């Protein structure tokens, strides 16, 4: 990925290109020492912008009337040098712990983003996490907690803002990390028995990471759409499916699906 940005000097040193400017990585290491973390905001911005543009292009091509929103998962990298370029290109945020939401709170207090940004809160909800969710909601941040189990369902009955709910779908996909994970969310039959849920706006799932085939990305979406249709019978305000799962990485030199091909199938 991003090989167009990198090159090698005549001395065999790694070099990075930003437009017509060049950074010699070896010189930076010699200047600042090791270990050295180097972040390239323009690459991050380009990747996010490209993702959003491709989705929007296929939505238009297929005459789909809905909208696409990208939520950056904070668990990937919480450094502000990484997060700020992401949200500068229109990304929303997704947290999975109280610590990550605290970082969101600090960025909001420093006025690094406006209150129109939407924050999805996944993961087990500790007392600290729950308190932060309620605090930021009171302060006007668009916070949507994703309910993962019975205790959370009971707690958020008094929550005035929008909520989502997570389904643990019984679907197996091929992924690079093809092993058993801890499961979160309600099983499909449990979910359908819940009936009406106050302020339910999102049906959420996370199927796996580094999914190796397009079929592995599309199959859970088809299942989610079926559940979505059934849940809307008692929850007409439900209007969003949160697609959770990671695209594959081609570790070997063999034919692999492209991001465009995957997005095209997802939209169709």
Describe each region flagged by the PLM.
Residues 78-82, 126-128, 168-182, 207-212, ...:
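Conserved radical SAM core fold
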Residues 120, 146, 164-168, 204-206, ...:
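Short beta-strand segments
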Residues 24-32, 202-208, 244-251:
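A short small-residue
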Residues 142-143, 201-213:
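Conserved strand-turn element in the central/C-terminal portion of the radical SAM core barrel
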Residues 213-268:
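C-terminal active-site-proximal or functional interface alpha/beta core segments in diverse enzymes
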Residues 152, 182-195, 216-226:
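Metal-dependent enolase-superfamily TIM-barrel catalytic cores that perform enediolate-based chemistry
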Residues 1-161, 165, 193-199, 233-235:
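A charged N-terminal "starter" segment
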Residues 33-35, 115-119, 138-143, 175-186, ...:
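Glycine-rich tight-turn/loop motif centered on a GG-T
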């Amino acid at each position: 990925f991003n090989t167009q940005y990198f090159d090698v000097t005549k001395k065999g040193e790694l070099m990075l290109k930003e437009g017509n400017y060049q950074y010699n990585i070896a010189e930076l290491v010699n200047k600042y020492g090791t270990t050295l973390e180097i972040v390239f905001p323009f690459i991050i911005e380009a990747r996010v912008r490209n993702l959003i543009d491709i989705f929007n292009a296929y939505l238009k091509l297929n005459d789909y009337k809905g909208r696409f929103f990208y939520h950056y998962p904070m668990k990937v990298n919480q450094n502000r040098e990484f997060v700020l370029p992401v949200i500068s290109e229109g990304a929303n945020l997704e947290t999975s712990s109280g610590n990550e939401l605290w970082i969101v709170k600090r960025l909001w207090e420093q006025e690094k983003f406006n209150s129109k940004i939407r924050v999805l809160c996944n993961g087990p909800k500790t007392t600290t996490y729950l308190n932060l969710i309620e605090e930021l909601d009171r302060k006007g941040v668009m916070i949507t907690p994703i309910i993962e189990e019975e205790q959370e369902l009971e707690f958020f009955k008094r929550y005035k803002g929008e909520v989502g709910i997570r389904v643990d779908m019984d679907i197996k996909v091929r992924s690079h990390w093809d092993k058993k994970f801890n499961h979160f969310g309600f099983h499909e039959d449990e979910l359908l028995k819940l009936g009406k849920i106050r302020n339910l706006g999102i049906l959420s799932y996370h199927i796996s990471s580094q999914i190796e085939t397009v079929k592995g990305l599309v199959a859970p979406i088809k299942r989610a759409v079926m559940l979505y249709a059934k849940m809307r019978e008692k929850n007409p305000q439900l209007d969003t499916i949160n697609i959770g799962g990671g695209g594959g990485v081609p570790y070997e030199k063999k034919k692999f699906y492209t991001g465009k091909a995957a997005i095209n199938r997802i939209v169709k």
